[in-house]
Protein backbone atom coordinates (compact mmCIF):
# COMPACT_ATOMS: atom_id res chain seq x y z
CA UNK A 1 0.00 0.00 0.00
CA UNK A 2 1.12 3.62 -0.51
CA UNK A 3 3.26 4.93 2.33
CA UNK A 4 5.58 7.84 3.04
CA UNK A 5 7.80 5.66 5.19
CA UNK A 6 11.24 4.83 3.79
CA UNK A 7 11.29 1.48 2.00
CA UNK A 8 14.09 -0.87 1.03
CA UNK A 9 13.81 -3.69 -1.48
CA UNK A 10 16.53 -6.30 -1.91
CA UNK A 11 17.36 -7.55 -5.40
CA UNK A 12 19.56 -10.63 -5.62
CA UNK A 13 19.60 -10.84 -9.41
CA UNK A 14 17.78 -9.46 -12.45
CA UNK A 15 17.16 -12.65 -14.43
CA UNK A 16 13.40 -12.59 -13.83
CA UNK A 17 13.18 -8.88 -14.69
CA UNK A 18 15.00 -9.47 -17.98
CA UNK A 19 13.46 -12.82 -18.93
CA UNK A 20 9.76 -12.81 -18.00
CA UNK A 21 8.92 -15.41 -20.67
CA UNK A 22 11.06 -17.93 -18.80
CA UNK A 23 9.39 -17.30 -15.44
CA UNK A 24 6.19 -18.44 -13.77
CA UNK A 25 3.17 -16.17 -13.41
CA UNK A 26 3.83 -15.96 -9.67
CA UNK A 27 7.39 -14.77 -10.30
CA UNK A 28 6.24 -12.25 -12.90
CA UNK A 29 3.64 -10.86 -10.49
CA UNK A 30 6.40 -10.43 -7.92
CA UNK A 31 8.52 -8.60 -10.51
CA UNK A 32 5.61 -6.22 -11.23
CA UNK A 33 5.42 -5.43 -7.52
CA UNK A 34 9.18 -4.92 -7.43
CA UNK A 35 9.03 -2.52 -10.38
CA UNK A 36 6.26 -0.52 -8.70
CA UNK A 37 8.27 -0.27 -5.49
CA UNK A 38 11.40 0.96 -7.26
CA UNK A 39 9.45 3.37 -9.45
CA UNK A 40 7.88 4.88 -6.32
CA UNK A 41 11.29 5.60 -4.77
CA UNK A 42 12.02 2.53 -2.69
CA UNK A 43 15.76 2.27 -2.07
CA UNK A 44 17.29 -0.78 -3.72
CA UNK A 45 19.75 -3.06 -1.97
CA UNK A 46 21.69 -4.89 -4.70
CA UNK A 47 23.72 -7.98 -3.80
CA UNK A 48 26.56 -7.24 -6.25
CA UNK A 49 27.99 -4.62 -8.58
CA UNK A 50 26.80 -6.69 -11.55
CA UNK A 51 23.23 -6.65 -10.26
CA UNK A 52 23.48 -2.92 -9.53
CA UNK A 53 24.71 -2.19 -13.05
CA UNK A 54 21.72 -3.95 -14.59
CA UNK A 55 19.33 -2.22 -12.21
CA UNK A 56 20.74 1.18 -13.18
CA UNK A 57 19.97 0.40 -16.81
CA UNK A 58 16.41 -0.60 -15.91
CA UNK A 59 15.79 2.14 -13.32
CA UNK A 60 18.13 5.08 -14.06
CA UNK A 61 16.77 7.32 -11.29
CA UNK A 62 16.70 4.73 -8.50
CA UNK A 63 18.91 4.94 -5.43
CA UNK A 64 20.90 1.70 -5.40
CA UNK A 65 23.11 0.55 -2.54
CA UNK A 66 25.51 -2.36 -3.05
CA UNK A 67 25.86 -4.65 -0.04
CA UNK A 68 27.35 -8.10 -0.52
CA UNK A 69 25.75 -11.11 1.09
CA UNK A 70 27.60 -13.20 3.65
CA UNK A 71 29.45 -16.46 3.22
CA UNK A 72 27.83 -19.80 4.03
CA UNK A 73 28.95 -21.49 7.22
CA UNK A 74 31.94 -23.73 6.70
CA UNK A 75 31.15 -27.42 6.89
CA UNK A 76 33.11 -29.00 9.73
CA UNK A 77 35.23 -32.06 9.13
CA UNK A 78 32.82 -34.00 11.34
CA UNK A 79 29.62 -32.83 9.62
CA UNK A 80 27.64 -35.54 7.92
CA UNK A 81 28.39 -36.09 4.23
CA UNK A 82 26.54 -38.76 2.26
CA UNK A 83 27.19 -40.03 -1.25
CA UNK A 84 24.04 -39.62 -3.40
CA UNK A 85 22.47 -43.00 -4.15
CA UNK A 86 22.49 -42.15 -7.85
CA UNK A 87 26.30 -42.19 -7.80
CA UNK A 88 26.73 -45.56 -6.10
CA UNK A 89 28.07 -47.15 -9.30
CA UNK A 90 30.56 -44.37 -10.06
CA UNK A 91 33.16 -45.70 -7.65
CA UNK A 92 36.11 -43.44 -6.93
CA UNK A 93 36.37 -41.90 -10.40
CA UNK A 94 37.30 -38.19 -10.37
CA UNK A 95 34.43 -35.87 -11.21
CA UNK A 96 33.52 -32.27 -11.89
CA UNK A 97 30.40 -31.09 -10.09
CA UNK A 98 27.81 -28.46 -11.01
CA UNK A 99 25.09 -27.64 -8.50
CA UNK A 100 21.92 -25.66 -9.14
CA UNK A 101 18.42 -25.86 -10.61
CA UNK A 102 18.46 -26.80 -14.30
CA UNK A 103 17.63 -23.32 -15.60
CA UNK A 104 18.63 -21.85 -18.96
CA UNK A 105 20.98 -19.41 -17.29
CA UNK A 106 22.99 -22.27 -15.77
CA UNK A 107 24.24 -23.14 -19.28
CA UNK A 108 24.34 -26.87 -18.58
CA UNK A 109 23.97 -28.10 -22.19
CA UNK A 110 27.19 -26.26 -23.14
CA UNK A 111 28.84 -27.63 -20.02
CA UNK A 112 28.01 -31.16 -21.22
CA UNK A 113 29.50 -30.37 -24.64
CA UNK A 114 32.64 -28.98 -23.04
CA UNK A 115 32.93 -31.93 -20.70
CA UNK A 116 32.76 -34.35 -23.63
CA UNK A 117 35.73 -32.57 -25.23
CA UNK A 118 37.71 -32.54 -21.98
CA UNK A 119 36.84 -36.15 -21.18
CA UNK A 120 38.49 -37.41 -24.36
CA UNK A 121 41.80 -36.45 -22.75
CA UNK A 122 40.83 -37.73 -19.28
CA UNK A 123 39.60 -41.27 -19.66
CA UNK A 124 38.04 -41.70 -16.21
CA UNK A 125 36.73 -38.16 -15.59
CA UNK A 126 32.99 -37.86 -14.82
CA UNK A 127 30.50 -34.96 -14.72
CA UNK A 128 27.86 -34.71 -11.99
CA UNK A 129 25.02 -32.18 -12.32
CA UNK A 130 22.89 -31.90 -9.18
CA UNK A 131 19.78 -29.75 -9.22
CA UNK A 132 16.02 -29.77 -9.44
CA UNK A 133 14.35 -29.94 -12.84
CA UNK A 134 13.84 -26.55 -14.48
CA UNK A 135 13.18 -24.84 -17.79
CA UNK A 136 16.30 -26.30 -19.42
CA UNK A 137 15.85 -29.93 -18.38
CA UNK A 138 14.77 -31.11 -21.84
CA UNK A 139 17.71 -29.44 -23.61
CA UNK A 140 20.11 -30.79 -21.02
CA UNK A 141 18.86 -34.33 -21.56
CA UNK A 142 19.12 -33.84 -25.32
CA UNK A 143 22.74 -32.75 -24.90
CA UNK A 144 23.52 -35.92 -22.96
CA UNK A 145 21.62 -38.11 -25.44
CA UNK A 146 23.66 -36.64 -28.31
CA UNK A 147 26.87 -38.06 -26.85
CA UNK A 148 28.20 -41.51 -27.63
CA UNK A 149 26.78 -44.15 -25.27
CA UNK A 150 30.10 -44.55 -23.44
CA UNK A 151 30.49 -40.79 -22.99
CA UNK A 152 26.87 -40.38 -21.89
CA UNK A 153 27.49 -42.93 -19.14
CA UNK A 154 30.04 -40.52 -17.67
CA UNK A 155 27.46 -37.72 -17.26
CA UNK A 156 25.30 -38.08 -14.15
CA UNK A 157 22.12 -36.00 -13.86
CA UNK A 158 21.14 -36.77 -10.29
CA UNK A 159 18.38 -34.23 -9.66
CA UNK A 160 17.74 -32.57 -6.34
CA UNK A 161 20.02 -33.67 -3.52
CA UNK A 162 20.08 -33.32 0.26
CA UNK A 163 22.37 -31.02 2.18
CA UNK A 164 24.37 -34.07 3.28
CA UNK A 165 24.74 -35.03 -0.39
CA UNK A 166 25.95 -31.54 -1.26
CA UNK A 167 28.58 -31.77 1.47
CA UNK A 168 29.84 -35.04 -0.01
CA UNK A 169 29.89 -33.64 -3.56
CA UNK A 170 31.95 -30.62 -2.55
CA UNK A 171 34.30 -32.78 -0.50
CA UNK A 172 34.89 -35.40 -3.20
CA UNK A 173 34.80 -33.41 -6.46
CA UNK A 174 37.95 -32.52 -8.37
CA UNK A 175 36.49 -29.12 -9.32
CA UNK A 176 33.25 -27.17 -9.57
CA UNK A 177 31.89 -25.87 -12.87
CA UNK A 178 29.83 -22.66 -12.76
CA UNK A 179 29.45 -21.51 -16.38
CA UNK A 180 26.29 -19.46 -15.84
CA UNK A 181 25.03 -16.86 -18.29
CA UNK A 182 24.00 -14.68 -15.34
CA UNK A 183 24.18 -14.78 -11.55
CA UNK A 184 23.23 -12.06 -9.13
CA UNK A 185 25.59 -13.32 -6.45
CA UNK A 186 26.44 -17.01 -6.61
CA UNK A 187 26.49 -18.82 -3.26
CA UNK A 188 27.90 -22.02 -4.82
CA UNK A 189 31.12 -20.11 -5.50
CA UNK A 190 31.59 -19.47 -1.79
CA UNK A 191 30.51 -23.01 -0.90
CA UNK A 192 33.19 -24.34 -3.25
CA UNK A 193 35.81 -22.03 -1.74
CA UNK A 194 34.87 -23.17 1.76
CA UNK A 195 35.43 -26.77 0.62
CA UNK A 196 38.83 -25.90 -0.90
CA UNK A 197 37.48 -26.74 -4.34
CA UNK A 198 38.95 -25.21 -7.54
CA UNK A 199 36.39 -23.45 -9.75
CA UNK A 200 35.80 -22.98 -13.46
CA UNK A 201 33.42 -20.05 -13.84
CA UNK A 202 31.93 -17.66 -16.34
CA UNK A 203 32.90 -14.09 -17.18
CA UNK A 204 29.28 -12.94 -16.89
CA UNK A 205 27.12 -11.60 -14.09
CA UNK A 206 28.55 -11.36 -10.59
CA UNK A 207 30.81 -14.41 -10.97
CA UNK A 208 34.05 -12.44 -11.60
CA UNK A 209 33.59 -10.14 -8.61
CA UNK A 210 32.55 -12.88 -6.17
CA UNK A 211 35.15 -15.42 -7.28
CA UNK A 212 38.03 -12.95 -7.55
CA UNK A 213 41.15 -14.89 -8.51
CA UNK A 214 39.78 -18.17 -7.11
CA UNK A 215 38.38 -19.33 -10.45
CA UNK A 216 39.37 -19.81 -14.06
CA UNK A 217 36.94 -17.55 -15.90
CA UNK A 218 35.90 -18.21 -19.50
CA UNK A 219 33.33 -16.99 -22.00
CA UNK A 220 30.36 -19.27 -21.23
CA UNK A 221 29.39 -19.38 -24.91
CA UNK A 222 32.82 -20.71 -25.93
CA UNK A 223 32.62 -24.49 -25.55
CA UNK A 224 36.26 -25.04 -26.53
CA UNK A 225 37.52 -22.54 -23.95
CA UNK A 226 35.34 -24.12 -21.31
CA UNK A 227 36.67 -27.58 -22.19
CA UNK A 228 40.25 -26.34 -21.96
CA UNK A 229 39.59 -24.80 -18.55
CA UNK A 230 38.02 -28.02 -17.26
CA UNK A 231 41.04 -29.98 -18.46
CA UNK A 232 43.49 -27.55 -16.87
CA UNK A 233 41.77 -27.46 -13.51
CA UNK A 234 41.77 -31.24 -13.09
CA UNK A 235 45.25 -31.95 -14.50
CA UNK A 236 47.42 -28.98 -13.46
CA UNK A 237 48.31 -29.44 -9.78
CA UNK A 238 50.12 -26.10 -9.58
CA UNK A 239 47.03 -24.31 -10.88
CA UNK A 240 44.78 -26.17 -8.45
CA UNK A 241 46.93 -25.13 -5.49
CA UNK A 242 46.90 -21.51 -6.70
CA UNK A 243 43.10 -21.48 -7.02
CA UNK A 244 42.62 -23.15 -3.64
CA UNK A 245 44.85 -20.59 -1.94
CA UNK A 246 43.05 -17.70 -3.62
CA UNK A 247 39.71 -19.21 -2.63
CA UNK A 248 40.67 -19.42 1.03
CA UNK A 249 41.55 -15.71 0.97
CA UNK A 250 38.51 -14.64 -1.05
CA UNK A 251 36.13 -16.52 1.24
CA UNK A 252 37.24 -14.34 4.15
CA UNK A 253 35.98 -11.24 2.33
CA UNK A 254 32.35 -12.21 2.92
CA UNK A 255 30.60 -12.36 6.29
CA UNK A 256 27.02 -12.01 7.48
CA UNK A 257 28.22 -9.76 10.30
CA UNK A 258 29.52 -7.29 7.73
CA UNK A 259 26.32 -7.59 5.68
CA UNK A 260 24.14 -7.00 8.74
CA UNK A 261 26.11 -3.94 9.85
CA UNK A 262 25.96 -2.36 6.40
CA UNK A 263 22.20 -2.95 6.24
CA UNK A 264 21.74 -1.43 9.70
CA UNK A 265 23.73 1.60 8.55
CA UNK A 266 21.48 1.91 5.51
CA UNK A 267 18.29 1.67 7.59
CA UNK A 268 19.60 4.26 10.06
CA UNK A 269 20.48 6.59 7.21
CA UNK A 270 16.94 6.35 5.85
CA UNK A 271 15.16 7.01 9.14
CA UNK A 272 17.50 9.80 10.22
Predicted regions and their residues:
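Carbohydrate transferase catalytic cores enriched for Leloir-type hexosyltransferases
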Residues: 1-272
Amino acid sequence: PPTKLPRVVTVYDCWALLNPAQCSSITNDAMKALRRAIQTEAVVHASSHATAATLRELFPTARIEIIYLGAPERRSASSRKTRPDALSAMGDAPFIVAIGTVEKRKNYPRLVEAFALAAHENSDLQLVIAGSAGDDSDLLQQAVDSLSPKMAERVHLIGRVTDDNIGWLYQQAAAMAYPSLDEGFGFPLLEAMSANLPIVGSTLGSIPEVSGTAAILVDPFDVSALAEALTNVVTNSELRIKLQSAGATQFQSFSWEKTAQQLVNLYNDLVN
